[in-house]
Each structure stands twice: as C-alpha cells, then as structure tokens.
Amino acid sequence: LRTRVLMDAGELGSRNLSVTWIELPSGAEQTLRSDEEAEQAYVVVRGVGSMSVAGDTQQVAEGDLILVPPATEHAIANNGDAELACVSVQSPPVAAAELYSDQLAEVAGYDDEDL
C-alpha cells in the first residue's frame, strides 16, 4: 500500500477537503477503518478489486465511484493481477498520517520509505 497526499486542507485554497492517491499492489488490502466525521469518496483510476462498506462488499473497477458515509467501516482490496490505484477525497479533511499510520507496507517491493 502506498499513499500520497495530493491536496491537504489549506492547500490550493481548500478549507474542507483532502485528496489522497492510493496504490495497492496485487493481493494488498487496506485495514478496515472508519472516521466519525468525514465523508469519503473513492474513485478507482486503474485496476480491479473489492470495496467493503458497512459490511457490504462489491467488486470495483476503473471508473467506479464509491461513497463512504461518516462513521462507516470500510476497506478496499486489490484482488486483481495488476496494481489498483484510486483517489480518495475526504470532507472534512482527514490527515493521511492518521488514516494510514496503523498500516505498514508489508507487501513485496514496498518498504517504509514508500509510505
């Protein structure tokens, strides 16, 4: 799992959004998580996988948008053969360090410097 903050609150004139790029190699998955206040939208940019939202798991592919309401457990997984990439938008903003601090990159080819 690799993440990169594309825009944080206060950048580019934004006050209420943060935008994060997420890459998951084949077989990787996020730790199940939720945020009490933030609404979140994922847009799959490439690859295929599955997204679990409030216990309901659906297959996702390039071009799909997934909405996650506040206080809702969710996770995305790459069950395809190629890398899965998506953009995540949160409002109110959530710091990427808070989102991913509990998940280490324990996938072949990734190390702590990639986070």
Annotated model-derived regions:
Residues 28, 37-38, 56, 72-73, ...:
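A generic "binding-loop/recognition-motif" signal
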Residues 20-22, 64, 74:
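Hydrophobic/aromatic beta-strand elements that line small-molecule binding cavities or substrate pockets
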Residues 31-32, 51-52, 68, 74-80:
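Short beta-strand His + acidic residue motifs that chelate non-heme Fe in jelly-roll/DSBH
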Residues 75-115:
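Double-stranded beta-helix
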Residues 1-32, 38:
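A short glycine-rich, His/Asp/Glu-containing loop-to-beta-strand
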Residues 21-25, 34-53, 89:
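Short, conserved beta-strand element in jelly-roll/cupin
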Residues 41, 55-70:
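Short acidic-glycine-tyrosine-enriched beta hairpin
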Residues 12-15, 24-29, 48-50, 57, ...:
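Short, charged/polar surface micro-motifs in flexible loops or helix N-caps
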